[in-house]
Amino acid sequence: MEGNITDGLKYVGAGLATLGMIGSALGVGNIFASFLDAAMRNPSAAPQQTGNLFIGMALAEALGIFSVLIAILILFVA
């Protein structure tokens, strides 16, 4: 009986760990929305800001990848 409860709680914990993907998706959407807003206001400055755009996107996506890694660790290691 206890093995089933711990397995169930493991799945709940892994599901809760993947909620970090929501923050990652919101962050990437916010980054691109801000970039497009700024590019429409000043099109000549957009090419210089493209590098910053991709750095911000990579950092925001890293949080989502970390949350998936935590979920995998909870499922298979814990």
Curated annotation (Swiss-Prot):
The record marks E61 as: Reversibly protonated during proton transport. The chain crosses the membrane at residues 16-36, 57-77. Keywords: ATP synthesis, Cell inner membrane, Cell membrane, CF(0), Hydrogen ion transport, Ion transport, Lipid-binding, Membrane, Transmembrane, Transmembrane helix, Transport. It is found in: Cell inner membrane. One of its GO terms (cellular component) is proton-transporting ATP synthase complex. Signal peptide: none annotated. F(1)F(0) ATP synthase produces ATP from ADP in the presence of a proton or sodium gradient. F-type ATPases consist of two structural domains, F(1) containing the extramembraneous catalytic core and F(0) containing the membrane proton channel, linked together by a central stalk and a peripheral stalk. During catalysis, ATP synthesis in the catalytic domain of F(1) is coupled via a rotary mechanism of the central stalk subunits to proton translocation. Key component of the F(0) channel; it plays a direct role in translocation across the membrane. A homomeric c-ring of between 10-14 subunits forms the central stalk rotor element with the F(1) delta and epsilon subunits. Belongs to the ATPase C chain family. This is ATP synthase subunit c. It comes from Hyphomonas neptunium (strain ATCC 15444).
